[in-house]
Amino acid sequence: EITTRLVGSEMCIRDRKKEVVFLQSVLDAGFKKYGRVIADIDTSEIVKLMDSYDMPEDVVYVAGDEKLENTQIHKVMEESIYGGCPVQTGYCNGHNQKLNALEYHRSSEVNIAATDMILLLGSREDVKDDFTYETSKVEGFFVPEGTAIEVYATTLHYAPCGVDGQGFKCVVVLPKGTNLDVVNTHATAEDKLLAASNKWLIAHEDAHIDGAFNGLRGENITV
């Protein structure tokens, strides 16, 4: 049995014998190798808008949403954060307590926490030559509601987890065209990880993700 204990900005995920993952805050120095907090933007408009979006019992991801892309922050993302490149602003909402998989892109991803949430992260440099990855290397980070973060392209990540069994809502910004259907030509060994456009995914076998490469070794971490 794994439970959580929230103390200030820190949380521990524990089982009865040992600590599985120590959760820091994205405001802590330990997050800097995975990403950065974008402190100079106002997220209040888009967080309030997300109040009207459902929080299903499973997890739903929408790559681009018309209402979210009609916000001021979407313009800021295109003009400033992504340096004039077109982006898509969507969301990932629902209930999730497991790691299940890790993915990466060739570009940074921006997340805006519309509720408190947890991200389980790793580094691409720890992926082995056979594209396996030890889940013991995963680190967890608490993201307070309203916080905008840039997750670097070198960071392994996946769907957020809720805090203390609650659901989560997360705005997701990526370069336009990411996470769409793709024809995999298997030109390189890495192509077996290609799950969608600009999305390389390593799954845990316990997650039973159809068509995914099951390269996560160790526990399928539960928050």
Question: What do these predicted regions represent?
Answer:
Residues 14-97, 220-223:
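N-terminal, charge-rich interaction modules
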Residues 162-223:
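Accessory, usually C-terminal, subdomains that scaffold auxiliary metal cofactors
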Residues 67-134:
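Extracellular-facing segments of soluble proteins and assemblies that are Gly/Ser/Thr-biased and enriched
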Residues 122-124, 130-133, 153-155, 159-164, ...:
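A short secondary-structure junction signal
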Residues 106-109, 116-117, 138, 146-147, ...:
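Short, surface-exposed beta-edge/turn micro-motifs
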Residues 143-163, 173-175:
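Conserved metal-binding segment of the jelly-roll/cupin
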Residues 2, 137-139:
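Short, conserved secondary-structure segments in the cores of folded domains
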Residues 1-13:
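Single conserved hydrophobic/aromatic residue that forms the stacking wall/gate
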